[in-house]
Amino acid sequence: DHRDLHSFPTRRSSDLIIFFDIDGTLLRLRAKELSEKTVEALNRLKANGIRLCIATGRTPVSLPHFSGIEFDTFLTFNGSLCYNDTETIFSNPISPDDVQKLIRNADSLGRPVSVATKSRLAANGFDIDLSDYYSIAHLQLTVAKDFEQVSNEEVYQLLLGCRETDYSAILKDVDGAKIAAWWDRAVDIIPANGGKGIGIQKVLEYYHLDKSEALAFGDGNNDIEMLLSVGTGVAMGNASPQLKEVADEICKDVAEDGIYDYCLTHGLI
């Protein structure tokens, strides 16, 4: 299903959209700001009328505000909440019943969890894996006094420290949620019918765009669905082997300004 990739930039730019993962794709891991070349590429894409969409497992609360560039659209919680400046495009929270089961399952493993709503990230305890997971997004893990209240609001995602061997215990008796992992010490738990793929589908419908008018850049296993949901899926040079397998193209490493280089060589900027 490898299309003629050179057909992508020749359309009217206003009919194009590019989805970007954040960590390891736009941003070098643990960096706070985008490289100058990445900012330049994004601004030139935007000047050419191309829509720019952040597509991340992060919560709206932990979205970075990069200096020098504004994105049009945000696909957060691995696709469960998509919005732009004016409205919500798609909202798909986890059922309250499953949220409570997941909290109990984590508790039986001796693991604290963090619940993420549109406006809050609240944890019921502290452990080093969860704390380190927070720090990747430059957040400080603190225990929320109102955890119970927040966990009864619309929860889009749960975060907890665990290993792959714990996955089945965490999901015990849970029908409507699944694990989306991009790090070996912690997981995001999202709706079973969620994922970046469904989010992208909803964003494309909203803007009346076809799959062939969309491009995506990613680096982790949680980007596999995203790359398969667009006309042209590009894996970063630093991407996981599994992602490179499904990608239409592979660009340079994030540390070598892979996005800038790809956009330049493909005539997008």
Predicted regions and their residues:
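Residue-level signal for inorganic ion chemistry
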Residues: 45, 78, 158, 200, ...
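Conserved acidic, metal-coordinating active-site core of Asp-based
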Residues: 105, 109-229, 238
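Short hydrophobic/aromatic-enriched beta-strand-loop microsegments
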Residues: 71-79, 135, 179-182, 233-237, ...
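Short, small-residue-biased leader/transition segments that mark boundaries at the very start
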Residues: 1-13
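Active-site phosphate-binding/coordination module
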Residues: 29, 36-129
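Short, structured coil segments at secondary-structure junctions
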Residues: 69-70, 78, 173-176, 229-230, ...
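Asp-based phosphoryl-transfer active-site loop
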Residues: 14-31
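Asp-based, Mg2+/Mn2+-dependent phosphohydrolase catalytic module
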Residues: 150, 229, 234-269
